[in-house]
Amino acid sequence: MAHVEVLARLQKETKCPICLDDLTDPVTVECGHNFCRSCIKDFWAGQQATSSCPVCRHQCQHRNLRSNAQLGNMIETAQLLQGMENKRHESSTSCERHNQALTLFCEDDLQLLCDQCVEPESHGRHQVLSITEAASLHRKHLQDYSKLLKWEVKEIQGLMSALNKRTVTLREQAEAQRSQLTSECEKLMRFLDQEERAAFSRLEDEEMRLEKRLLDNIAALEHHGSSLRDLLRHLMLTGELSEAKMLSTVKDFYLNCRRQLISPSIFPVQLRRVEYSFPLQYSALQKVIQHFTDNVTLDLKTAHPNLLISKDRTCVTFTKKRQRIPGSSSFTKSPVVLGIPHFNSGRHFWEVQVGKKPKWAIGICKADSSIGERQSPNPWGYWRIVWQGDSFNVSGADPDSRLKAARATSIGVFLDYELGEVSFYGMPEKCHLYTFRDTFSGPVCPYFYIGPQSEPLRLCSATDSEC
């Protein structure tokens, strides 16, 4: 039986790993494996960017197919040997028990039989067919199995092809993320560099301001000390005068002494901490936008009569024609409108498109701040930043001051009610502009000063922020 095993090994080598049939027009790929020419071409047709071997997964750089004529000859030889083996097997097949030709086949036991094997105690009630009928039937069964297995192999090959494509897609996505990460890191480094320079500039300005104040204090003290020394010399000279002469001058001396003993005003000198924003807020802002964005809209009842509000109450424009406002407008002096909802707890984010408006103010105010607006607005009820001309200003609960920041076309506002903070960001760069720190004692609401220009101011919805 050794020659049978050798023939089986030879036949295995002549099968195509893709279709599992004898190799047709065999070709060899660069890793050394062999396939039918049509099979490997069909397999590679599903791979756009790569060409991998279905057996070893080797990435073939070039789709070079080398015809293998020698292997084709071996296949023909193996087929001839198999035919000879089949004839020899048919001629030599006999029943080992009865030494008769095996001419029958038991369908129940799937066993070859001779005429004497068909006995009641063993196969009497079984379905027994002639070897020709059984062979014909089982060839059909085997063909069905062959179709099923080939279909399964094709499915596996398709899945492998899809996974190969997924591998390519994965690499492309990873490369895209690497590029995006590089870009984001470069932006972050530029942001940090700009923030560092701006912080150092603010620190230098503060240092120079305090140095000037110190020099002013020193000059005032020097002048005061000089005056005191002059007074002391005058005192010593007065003491040397005659009694009558001395007494005639003491009145002027006492008056002069009282004036000179008043110490000059010394201005306090304390270096304040320079405001800056570094990666913590920068990286966390996207999560803030995702989790805390509110759909803020404009409260029509609070709008100045010269403000035109859109139907969806997200856009406001200054117009010279006064509008009919239901009820009594809260703001009659300034082109202001408030937003809804009001907030008395929680964290909230909203974004406002300001475009290139030359003047505007955005922030929050106490929900009842507008009640006294007709008389005199209370600056302590507001927390807002103002753009005017070419710079930002802080206006409200903190002392008014100018911010060194580039112009932004959109402003993000983040309110943390319990923490007592309202922060402003230049969008879409997510550049921190300013943070108010205070204690809120009642409801607050969004505040919008439009300015007397025709350019609109627009609120972004929660779905399109950043807008």
UniProtKB/Swiss-Prot annotation:
GO molecular-function terms, A-Z: zinc ion binding
Disulfide bond sites: none
Record-linked PROSITE patterns: B302_SPRY, ZF_BBOX, ZF_RING_1, ZF_RING_2
Principal location: cytoplasm
Coiled coil: 168-222
Chain intervals annotated as zinc finger (B box-type): 90-131
Zinc finger (RING-type): 16-57
Domain of life: Eukaryota
Compartments it resides in: Cytoplasm, Cytoskeleton, Spindle
UniProt family annotation: Belongs to the TRIM/RBCC family.
Record-given protein name: Tripartite motif-containing protein 75
Organism expressing this protein natively: Mus musculus
Lineage: Eukaryota, Metazoa, Chordata, Craniata, Vertebrata
Originating gene: Trim75
